Amino acid sequence: VQVSPNTITGGDNGSGYSDEHKTIEGFAFTQMSGVGWFGDLGNFLVMPTTGKLQKIAGKEDGSIKGYRSAYDKATEIAKAGYYSVELTDYKIKVESSATPHCGILQFTFPSSEQSRIQIDLARRVGGTSTSQYVKVLDDHTIQGWMKCTPDGGGWGNGEGNSDYTVYYYAQFSKPLSNYGFWSADIPDDWVRKRDEVVSIPYLTRVSQAPVIKDKKE
């Protein structure tokens, strides 16, 4: 487990975080260390937000808006086993740590009637997972998996033949009083790799996906 802020999905950013980027799109629980070639992993992206629901992260250059947030570098604390930062767009303090088998995120929200935690199961550095599953076990717990294949890009933009499944089990300190899912209808003939998943047509499809409520999986 490597919990890290992630700043960009497309491109070569296997470590997740790049100092020159001015925004954070979420905090992922897996990172590819020590290798380039367009990167991979960056799975189970978690982002705390407030205000109107945004279904896409948007683009790092600001050309497409989304739930990503600017952050205050003066508030960053990074040391072995701990990282924290303030997301200035939401005024949320994020703290993260990890154990050998799990990652921990703590969010300190401002007073708001529209506070939420968003989880992107499709997100993957340099591409996307090709199938996902989530099940709500109780009002504090979800579990499921994400399947990543070369068809979804990743290492070498698919040429590295990276093929893996990430299984997750997540517990929340507060009950899930109001939740929903959304799944975009992506045509079978669309390429789903590094550049395509951050293209305007692809992001438009995801942003227009309906929110499904009152279902457990």
What do these predicted regions represent?
Residues V1-E217:
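Accessory carbohydrate-recognition regions in carbohydrate-active enzymes
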